[in-house]
Regions:
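A short acidic, Gly/Pro-enriched loop at the edge of an enzyme's catalytic core
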Residues: 1-5
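A short, flexible beta-alpha/helix-coil linker loop
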Residues: 9-12, 37
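Short "lid" loop at the C-terminus of a central beta-strand within the Rossmann-like core
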Residues: 10-11, 42-46
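Glycine/threonine-rich flexible loop motifs
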Residues: 12-19
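A short glycine-rich, Lys/Arg-flanked "PGG" loop and its adjoining helix->strand segment in the class I
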Residues: 19-33
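Conserved Class I S-adenosyl-L-methionine
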Residues: 24, 48-69
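Conserved beta-strand signature within the Rossmann-like core of class I S-adenosyl-L-methionine
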Residues: 34-41
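Soluble small-group transferase modules, centered on the S-adenosyl donor enzyme superfamily
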Residues: 63-149
């Protein structure tokens, strides 16, 4: 696939098996070279830290976009495209398709962060696996005094 979209929240929760390293490896195995996977992740709980760290364990290239109080992670199967290339494509698609939401405006919200730096993503966050995925517990523990840049 060129694109896989994951939006599996049921109320405030997401099924734990859709946030594990093994799940993301299966997703990656089904992506074409240069394909992307996008997933909505709520940033206000410790689950965000573990989810991002888990995604990054399979997809080392991640972009982040703000979306109505949530963060959409976009992970790449292969190298990321340059900012200039993405901007040119966004402008072309905006003009060609008259989309409801401007891709150029969304691209302006693009952020990249260092996963291992510990400044935004908690250095103690655990990678979620099929054998260890306390999703509901992490979802219920609020993150304090940190904001996504």
């Amino acid at each position: 696939y060129d694109i896989i979209l994951i939006d599996a929240y049921r109320g405030p929760f997401v099924p734990f098996h859709l946030l594990t390293k093994e799940f993301y490896q299966i997703v990656k195995d089904h992506l074409a070279d240069g394909g992307v996977v996008a997933q909505n992740v709520e940033p206000s709980t410790m689950l965000f830290d573990s989810a991002v760290k888990t995604i990054a364990s399979v997809f080392p290239e991640l972009d982040f976009y703000r979306a109505d109080g949530n963060i959409v992670t976009v992970a790449y199967a292969g190298p990321t495209r340059s900012a200039e290339d993405l901007a040119a494509t966004a402008r072309e698609r905006d003009a060609a398709f008259g989309l409801r939401y401007s891709l150029s405006d969304m691209l302006a919200q693009r952020r990249r962060i260092q996963i291992d730096g510990g400044k935004v993503i908690d250095a103690n966050a655990k990678i979620l696996t099929d054998d260890f995925a306390p999703v509901e517990t992490l979802k219920n523990i609020e993150r304090h005094n940190r904001k996504l840049p």
